[in-house]
């Protein structure tokens, strides 16, 4: 199961994790140097008081706390993996700050780097899409004309991440496969403004993509990794080392979070999977991530494998 490890923002010996897929609704601190553990958040009784069938509390593998590690956004499931609610939790004060009943189970949730917003992302649900809620789920969002407690960031749930722009503001970075150019874009969580960064539908091709915005100490940059590219004329055929392969395919690169962004290639992510691997083929995706000051990058590859 997924323990969702999250490193302490300043102590490299400490991380936080949830039990197997959030069962038990606790958050534990682990010192990897001493192997000492302590429960820093036992949310079970409180969550059951809101939702009697509550059984798990997690981000569903794709979320993170605020950049300072204080604020957490968690989705709550029952023992049948049906979503019942979302909460925000203050680790410093061990206090529930807000909660919301769920109209449908999200694909994942995450706290924004600033700790001001809980981003809830629903897959295959254009009405709900991906939304940035105010931390208590009741205060109207400043960018909502209808005085709702959220702004809609996207009509889909795509591979995405939350990052900080150069001004230190929260942004949502994702790809829009429904756009004419398959744009990679960002949305400012405070203003709701969307900015296109670069197209991905190049010369009849498309690519799968991941983002990491975890370089909070280097605001204004995100990490991008691509894989699984294809041409519209033959989606089953690899473009590797052909004239149809484009500049971004099979790459790890940094992108500045601004209009007309800088693109800085970092590495080749020459990774392919085999159908015989079954579900393990998922781990052939590069899924690149970056450290807090953008001096280290980690990614998967099957090159020469």
Where are the model-predicted features located?
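Structural motif
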Residues: 22-29, 80-88, 126-138, 179-186, ...
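Blade-level signature of beta-propeller repeat domains, shared across WD40, Kelch, NHL, RCC1
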Residues: 281-305
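Asp-box/WD-like beta-propeller blade repeats and closely related beta-sheet repeat scaffolds
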Residues: 24-111
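Surface-exposed loop and turn segments in beta-propeller and other repeat-based domains
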Residues: 1, 41-55, 146-156, 192-209, ...
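Blade-terminus and WD-like Trp-Asp/Gly-His loop motifs, strongest in beta-propeller folds
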Residues: 3-15, 51-72, 108-120, 153-174, ...
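Short loop/turn segments that connect beta-strands within beta-propeller blades
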Residues: 31-35, 90-94, 136-143, 189-192, ...
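Acidic, serine/threonine- and glycine-rich low-complexity intrinsically disordered segments
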Residues: 98-208
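Loop/turn-rich, solvent-exposed surfaces of beta-rich toroidal or solenoidal domains
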Residues: 199-271
């Amino acid at each position: 199961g997924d323990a969702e490890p999250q490193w302490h923002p300043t102590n490299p010996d400490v991380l936080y994790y949830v039990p197997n897929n959030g069962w038990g609704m606790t958050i534990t601190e682990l010192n990897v140097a001493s192997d000492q553990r302590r429960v820093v958040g036992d949310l079970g009784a409180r969550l059951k008081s809101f939702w009697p069938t509550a059984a798990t509390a997690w981000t569903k593998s794709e979320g993170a706390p605020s950049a300072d590690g204080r604020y957490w956004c968690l989705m709550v499931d029952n023992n049948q993996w049906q979503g019942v609610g979302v909460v925000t939790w203050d680790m410093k004060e061990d206090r529930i700050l807000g909660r919301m009943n769920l109209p449908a189970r999200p694909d994942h949730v995450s706290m924004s780097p600033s700790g001001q917003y809980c981003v809830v992302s629903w897959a295959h649900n254009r009405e709900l899409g991906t939304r940035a809620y105010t931390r208590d789920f009741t205060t109207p969002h400043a960018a909502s004309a209808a005085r709702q407690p959220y702004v809609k960031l996207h009509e889909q749930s795509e591979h995405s991440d939350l990052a900080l722009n150069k001004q230190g503001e929260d942004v949502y970075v994702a790809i829009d496969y429904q756009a004419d150019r398959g744009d990679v874009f960002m949305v400012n969580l405070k203003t709701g403004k969307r900015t296109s960064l670069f197209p991905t539908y190049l010369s009849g091709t498309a690519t799968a993509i991941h983002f990491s915005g975890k370089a909070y100490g280097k605001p204004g940059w995100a990490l991008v990794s691509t894989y699984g590219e294809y041409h519209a004329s033959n989606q089953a055929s690899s473009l590797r080392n052909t004239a149809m392969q484009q500049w971004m395919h099979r790459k790890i690169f940094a992108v500045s979070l601004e209009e007309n962004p800088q693109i800085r290639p970092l590495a080749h992510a020459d990774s392919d999977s085999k159908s015989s691997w079954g579900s393990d083929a998922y781990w052939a995706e590069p899924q690149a991530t970056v450290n807090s000051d953008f001096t280290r990058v980690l990614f998967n590859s099957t090159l020469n494998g």
